[in-house]
C-alpha cells in the first residue's frame, strides 16, 4: 500500500514538484548554490504547474462555453418558433375577422336589409301570436274561424279563431265579424303579416 501511494502522487503531481520533493528528502543540508538552483527550479516549476492547470481549465471552459452556446441556440430557435406561430395565429384571426366583416357588410348593403326585416318580423309575429292567442280567442267567435279559414294559407291558426280578417264580404254579418276581430289586441299580428 505504501508503494502504491507514491506512484499515485507521482502521476498526480508534475515532474518538477516530484524532483523538488525528492531532492529535499535526499539532501539533508545544502550549500548556497544548491539553494539558488532550487529557487530557480521552483520558479520554473510554478510556471509549469500554472500551465498545466490553465490547460485543464481551458479545456473544461471550452466545453462549458460550447454547451452553453448549443443550449442558447436551442432556446432561441424554440422561442422564435413560438413567436412566429403566435403571429401567424393572430394574422389568421385578423383575416378571418376581416372576411367576416366584409361578408357581413356586403350582405347588409347588397339588399339584405329587407330580407332581414322579413326574417325578424315572422319571429316577432310568432311571439306575439303565442302571447296573444288567449286574448284573440276570447274576443273572436268560432263562426269567424270557419269563415276566415281560407283567408291566408301562410298563417296557421292554433286557436279556435284565425286572427287575419276574411276578404270583404257583401253581407253585414261578415263585416261585423271582421271589425270585431280588428278591434282586438291582435292588430300587431296583422301589421306583421302585411310587412312580411
Swiss-Prot record:
Region (Disordered): 93-184
Residues carrying a glycan: 19, 26
Compartment(s) where it occurs, according to its Swiss-Prot or TrEMBL record: Membrane
Gene Ontology CC annotation, any one: membrane
Topological domain ranges for the Cytoplasmic compartment: 82-196
Membrane topology: Single-pass type I membrane protein
Residue ranges of the TM segments: 61-81
Main location: membrane
Keyword terms: Glycoprotein, Membrane, Signal, Transmembrane, Transmembrane helix
InterPro entries noted in UniProt: C11orf87 (IPR037670)
Keyword Cell wall biogenesis/degradation: no
First and last residue of the signal peptide: 1-23
Start-end of Low complexity biased regions: 172-181
Bias-annotated ranges (Pro residues): 161-171
Residues exposed to the Extracellular side: 24-60
Domain of life: Eukaryota
Biased composition (Basic and acidic residues): 95-106, 124-135
Protein name stated in the entry: Uncharacterized protein C11orf87 homolog
Amino acid at each position: 500500500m505504501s508503494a502504491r501511494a507514491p506512484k499515485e502522487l507521482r502521476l498526480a503531481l508534475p515532474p518538477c514538484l516530484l524532483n523538488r520533493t525528492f531532492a529535499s528528502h535526499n539532501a539533508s543540508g545544502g550549500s548556497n548554490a544548491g539553494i539558488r538552483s532550487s529557487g530557480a527550479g521552483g520558479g520554473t516549476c510554478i510556471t509549469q504547474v500554472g500551465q498545466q492547470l490553465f490547460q485543464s481549465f481551458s479545456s473544461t471552459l471550452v466545453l462549458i462555453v460550447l454547451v452553453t452556446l448549443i443550449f442558447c441556440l436551442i432556446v432561441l430557435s424554440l422561442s422564435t418558433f413560438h413567436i412566429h406561430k403566435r403571429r401567424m395565429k393572430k394574422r389568421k384571426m385578423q383575416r378571418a375577422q376581416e372576411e367576416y366583416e366584409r361578408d357581413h357588410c356586403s350582405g347588409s348593403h347588397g339588399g339584405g336589409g329587407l330580407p332581414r326585416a322579413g326574417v325578424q318580423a315572422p319571429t316577432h309575429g310568432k311571439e306575439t301570436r303565442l302571447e296573444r292567442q288567449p286574448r284573440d280567442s276570447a274576443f273572436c267567435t268560432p263562426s269567424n274561424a270557419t269563415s276566415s279559414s281560407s283567408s291566408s294559407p301562410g298563417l296557421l291558426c292554433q286557436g279556435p279563431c284565425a286572427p287575419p280578417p276574411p276578404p270583404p264580404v257583401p253581407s253585414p254579418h261578415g263585416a261585423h265579424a271582421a271589425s270585431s276581430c280588428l278591434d282586438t289586441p291582435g292588430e300587431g299580428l296583422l301589421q306583421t303579416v302585411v310587412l312580411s
